[in-house]
Structure formats: structure tokens, C-alpha cells
Amino acid sequence: MAVALGCAIQASLNQGSVFQEYDTDCEVFRQRFRQFQYREAAGPHEAFNKLWELCCQWLKPKMRSKEQILELLVLEQFLTILPTEIETWVREHCPENRERVVSLIEDLQRELEIPEQQVDMHDMLLEELAPVGTAHIPPTMHLESPALQVMGPAQEAPVAEAWIPQAGPPELNYSATGECQNFLDPGYPLPKLDMNFSLENREEPWVKELQDSKEMKQLLDSKIGFEIGIENEEDTSKQKKMETMYPFIVTLEGNALQGPILQKDYVQLENQWETPPEDLQRDLAKLVDQQNPTLGETPENSNLEEPLNPKPHKKKSPGEKPHRCPQCGKCFARKSQLTGHQRIHSGEEPHKCPECGKRFLRSSDLYRHQRLHTGERPYECTVCKKRFTRRSHLIGHQRTHSEEETYKCLECGKSFCHGSSLKRHLKTHTGEKPHRCHNCGKSFSRLTALTLHQRTHTEERPFKCNYCGKSFRQRPSLVIHLRIHTGEKPYKCTHCSKSFRQRAGLIMHQVTHFRGLI
């Protein structure tokens, strides 16, 4: 399989190579791109922008040609279709070019003597791995089809019981009769098969159902062999010693690379009759856990044990914040919140405005900023129909209608709707002007006033009209200008119902109504 695919890849990728440029950082960005989850982002805009950024960091379109990018994509797909162990083995060897990738796989196949198609090594492994004191089941006991072949009473070498284990946790206990107990953990139980029924029992109704069941076919096709036999009393003592040994299980397909190494360790331990070391136990535990046993329901009226229910998934309790920032110790409920918070420490601002080039920490901030260029004001006051770009501005404005003024100046007694307004007002009492222009030395009490002033020196006009292309230094000037194109006149006279684009126009008009009274 891999040889044919390798030849195809080698024939199609014969121009240039990017392996030497494919460093560890590229692999990190590739994994982050493939493993990125939607829940890690605050919304669809941030998720799309993050995927775009990770893809560019991985493929580097500004540095690589289209052919090199295609080569990387084909390489990734080629490694993906390989068996898991071969893919891991190839990545660990860090081949310097594509020819080396193909040759590594071909050398590995020749070393292991694995055909291109599926190989059945069942009998060979049973011969090599059968421990001392065990005997093979006679050919009549080999379960080669879904029909259970049961040894008759006239066999010369009868076996007490035969057990076909499915992959499970690392600890097995064997009774004196060779019965396998506690093979699987409580979360994934494996029913026990009573192999001591007579030929007449095969005619019972549930036997046919068990033979044709999907679960039994999975057991018979699982490519796992493990046989236990007790022939005489002398072998019984060795069998009891084997009960303390860690069981050795090798899958023929999923772990072909790990099998020979573990087999060698097992033979050494078998000769010593000692408890296996912890490192071997961990390797065997990983090997067994990879099988992920799954079985269905137990047939009715059978002597199979009832399986236990799997352990329920642990739910996160309300208010739990498992994600902790290593810099400041602040905790968050979601990983995406922690990711956004860590940008504060790193100073990263990945979201850039295409109009003015200003960068932002979050995509939501960029989206809100772009309203300054488009003039969009989605939040409208239901009382005076005035519109705002931010919800917080609308809430503050609505307080003017409800006459809610919670912030009071202790100097003059004046009240304000916002704390920022009170803070700005206090500077009038102290005369504080902390913001100074470096060009002309003029000082301002507000940073926004300094920003607007500096545009007079730089002649910067960041607010551009999308209709006529005219630019403005301030956003309010753009908003007023846009009303010329839209025909909007939000300021209405309460006396004659005449409307105006600007508030100043309304005030000048209202003077005409009161001119005779003055």
C-alpha cells in the first residue's frame, strides 16, 4: 500500500522541495490550524480571522510559490493516509526531502516483511509468544467463522476452556481452570463465554442468535490471539506463577511496530519469573488501551454476564474556571477567554483595520472600529431617535431622558450621568492638562482633544466617505456629511415640524419663533 502511494507521490512531486524549510514552527502552526475549534474564538469573525492567520503562518504564501504550497498539502495528506505507527515513525526521523520519506517507508516494510495488503500473522505470533506451560488449542477449536466450533468429547487433548480476549486494561487474573477474569474495566465490560456446553446445546434458540450477532463477528475477526492450557499437575505450578505475570497482548494490525520490542522484553521477564518493571507495564497499558473495546447487548436467555454501564462524563460545575493565566494567575471559564487575555501580556494585536491600519486585540474591537469608517450607528434611542455606534453610548444617552444623574461633583454640586464625565469635569477645577502636543507644546485636558489637534499638523484625514471619497479629520464631521447623501434630517422643530441635518441649524431656526417675544 505505502509503496504504491510512495511511488505516486515521488512521481508527482519531482520539482523543488520545501522540506528543508519546513521547520518545527511550521509543524506547530499546521497542528494549530488543523486542531483549531470554533469554541476557542469569541465569534465567527474572530474564528475566521484566526484560521486565516494560522494558515498563512503554516504555508507562508509570501515566501513560498504555489507549487511549494501544493507540495506541503500533498505531503500532509500522504502522511495522514499512512498507518498511525508508520506516520509517527516517519515524523520522528525528520526526513530531509520527499525521496527520503518514500525510502524510509520502503525500508521499514522490507525490515518488517509486511505485504502491501493486510497480513494475517495469527498462528505465527501464537507460536512465538505462547508462554511456558501453555498449549495450543487443537485445529477443531480454531474459530475461523461465525459458527462456533466446539471440541467433541472424544478429543485426545481436551482443553478446559478457551477464551478469546478483547483489548482492555492491563490487569488480568486467571483462575486455576484457565478462566479469564476482570479482563475489562467496569466502563467497558466483556461478557464471558462458557465454552463447556455440549453439542446438543448448540440447538438452543439463543445459540443461533449469538453466532449471527455482529458483536460475535467482531470478536472472531479481532486478530487477537491468547491461549491458555493446563495439561498436567507439573504445568499447574508454572501456570500459577504466570498468574502474577503481566499479560502480553499484541495486535497484528494496529501495533506492528511495537510488537517485536515488547515481545523481547516479555521473553526476558518470562525466564526470570519476576514482576515486570513499571516502564514495561506503562507500555503494555498504552498498547491495550489503544484497542477501545466496544460490544453490544447480551442475548436474552444466555449465560453471558450483564455488562455494566459506562461511567458518565464528568460535567463542569457552574462557576468553575479551570483555565489559569501563568503570568498573572487570573482564571477563566473558557480557553478562548484565556487566549484573548494572554494577548494583553504579549502585546499581540492580530486584527488590523484595512482602512487606517490600526490594530486591535480582539476582532469585536475591530468590528466596532470599522463603524467609524462606514458611519454605521446600529443603536437608536427610542425617545429622540438619535443613533449611536456603541450600546454603552446609547445607555448613557438614555439617562439624559430619565434625568438619572448618579455622579455628583463635590466642588460645585453638578451631577453627571457617567463617571468619565465627572472625571473630565473635575479637571476644570484643578486646571489639569496632562496631554501635551510635541509639535507646538499646546496642552489639553483630554486625550481625544490632543488626537484631533495633532491631525492639524499631520493633515491626517482617516474618516472617508464611501459615496464621494471626501475625507474628514473627525468622525462627527463624516456623520454630518453622510446625511447629505442619505437625506437624513434627525433634528425636528417642535413648533413647525421642519427638520434639519445639524443641531446648530435647528437652534438657529428656533430663534425665528422666539424673535418677536424678545
Curated annotation (Swiss-Prot):
Keyword Transmembrane helix in record: no
Cell compartments where the protein resides: Nucleus
One BP term from GO: spermatogonial cell division
Start and end residues of each SCAN box domain: 30-112
Position of the signal peptide: none
Keywords: DNA-binding, Metal-binding, Nucleus, Repeat, Transcription, Transcription regulation, Zinc, Zinc-finger
InterPro entries cross-referenced by the UniProt entry: SCAN_dom, SCAN_sf, Znf_C2H2_sf, Znf_C2H2_type
The keyword Lyase appears for this protein: no
Cystine residue pairs: none
Domain of life, source organism: Eukaryota
Family from the record: Belongs to the krueppel C2H2-type zinc-finger protein family.
Function field: May be involved in transcriptional regulation.
Name listed for the protein in its UniProt record: Zinc finger protein 449
Originating organism: Pan troglodytes
